[in-house]
């Protein structure tokens, strides 16, 4: 090689250097350092001769200098790689320098001379600047921070950076500049002590250049400048890799402001970054589509696939996520300034008018964008700004955004209604105290929705278990019958007497396996998740724990608590006086009767169930021992509310007086008067309002059987979201069937009873009804697995499909022999579950589901049409059922599977349900959530049967495009919609349109009721599980007190 053979006196020709530049850097470490140094010096000598020409440089001159610089860069690269470590300048002159070329570069001020010459190149300045930036980029990347300490390197670097301000460069030059700035930010982040070099030295350098006439004074009128940050600002909204690198470097600068207050002060007071970010965000929002093209009947929110497919939305989300990151890492001054600009310059003037538009399409798009924003941002400061925006009463002529959103829950437009409920699902998922107070708690804190005689029950735990039984009993009769028929009837399975089935169901044949095959209420589940409440218990446990963790951070505690023993004050005295006057009018009959020493009932005349009140009782001793002392609704930090709200003084008492009441009859009259406040709500006649939000939800629930399937999915999910809150006040409305409610609308439990009666009346337990129920359930299961495997099917090859079908067929041959005719029909859907399937019943919104092992594939699969076991008599199934069977085993993919191949976006939009907000684009629930004793739960959930696999989980789970639906009932189809906003469910309509279920004698109304029955049945199981888990939470809380 020429480098090793050279004597050092000559300079190789250009043709000899080329091969060295092309050699891998690892092969160049055996070079001769002396030869490299001589060649480096010779190239500089030739370049310097061109630079010293007095005449303006010509094209050839510039090309010659650039060529020599290129070779010098290559030699520096070889030397730096050979040295591995730079130590300059040499502290001791005892030996040769470790990097002689670099030593020569610095000692001879080559960089400064090169910069001075570049200023005279005129129209060739950009080409020379590009080579300079390459040189600096190389040196910074290989020497890290060592060279920044040396003035021969730092001074020309600051000069070239200062001269780049305000300039417009070609793309290749911009790229090199941003890369260099990014590298400098990384070095400064690792060596904060060097930060002042670029802050103050840059200031001095700018002043010098102003004096020399090379640079114009800054427009801001100040020479204070953080040169790196200033150069990065113009690229903050750029697209592509250039914009990403610039934003990354700016974030490093923001993080540096936390370590250096001078940087924070400069960015907040002298830079324009905050106004630029906000105005850019508003401009990008204005470019978003004003009307979103809805391609599926169940579309309700923007998904990650939508973001990637819409360029304008991608740019907007990049800017929003950058603002979120700035608030997270920047100095407090910068953070506060950006939040103020965001609220005054984007949230109020841009989002406000967009949401308050009157056009329905515009409302849908604006609310979808707001929902996407709330799911994307994570910084509490930004979330507080958006909550303030929702509750602001001054910016929009006295109209609150939150009230406008609540009104849209009543919209007859199904798409607007679903988008609104999805938005409220996100809002409730924030677990924000202010929002919950405005939506629910401020209407419930007075306690007027609960009669006085029932308020002592609110903190009791036992009724929660009774509520679980209550919810299970509300299941429609046809669902109970279908569930009973679906149980395997095997004479080889002995009866287990320890588990008692529900009274409303026939005694099933018990299985030897306890745990995975049985739920907590004695309902046999076999290898299916159908009727397996354990899966709901697991989900409820995790959701409630997450909600409880967030609610513990609230400023107030919205629950019924013990009244303090002392200091009732004027409210106590006033209540006592009013009560005495009341009882004096009625005489002392019932009260005087207490002199006998026996516990008797105190009744109030003409106050009965019609007003929502029960007669006042002297509770037995055993009940008092279990109940909490007389309670009131209070907050932890609102003492004024305790004295100003008459409703909060409705029940007054103390634990010490409770004991006296129990032991001394002579004090009982006075103590009863002390505990009751009849000032306002004694004669309330059921006119208490629960607020517009709950009234809208109850109104939608009352039309449950008339709503579309997808509206009901979101509705049930929203109510489930409320039930997750560990607040007894909310439980008194949703989970406590033993507490009467006095409101101007039917209570939640009354509506559920009405719905059960309506379904039972219109869908009686007949053969036709059972067939329609089976079709509804099977179609929902079929579409869930179709959605879960849509992407996998698109990506798979014919070999993949062949192996998948073979696996399903083989696994189907291993089961199904012991199933009844109805069970076999229910299982007719060919579940496409493979070892790569993403179905995980325990995670509702995790956007990367785990695969299922081959060992449980058989639990999901069914026989194909050709291998299915026919009924013994060969004709027990009707011709209509045979057609249904053929439809779900063969024709289903042709009928509804075209959506996957035609529109990937539709598929991504389709994987949705109605209950959580953890489908943020970035945050996901932990995968390892578990509870004590949940081994059987996980076993039961993993071994799910396709006949009901998805219908027992995630009834109210919200999923995005990267998730696979975990619920049959909530895996909403995303195919093209042909029925408009109020079209009926696509799967059943498709079946009916082909005449496949004509023989079932089912009308369109009965099919709708069948869907409602299946959905309601599974939702009630979920509510039962939540009630049981909430009782566990209360026991834990009381045990820790």
Swiss-Prot record:
Residues 619-648, 792-818, 858-879, 903-947, 959-986 are annotated as: Disordered. The keyword RNA-binding does not apply. InterPro entries: FHIP (IPR019384), FHIP_C (IPR045669), FHIP_KELAA_motif (IPR045668). The modification Phosphoserine is found at residues 490, 797. The keyword rRNA-binding does not apply. Residues 628-637, 800-818, 903-925, 959-968 have a biased composition (Polar residues). Keywords: Phosphoprotein. Residues 927-947 have a biased composition (Low complexity). It comes from the Eukaryota. Belongs to the FHIP family. This is FHIP family protein CG3558. It comes from Drosophila melanogaster. The lineage of its organism: Eukaryota, Metazoa, Ecdysozoa, Arthropoda, Hexapoda.
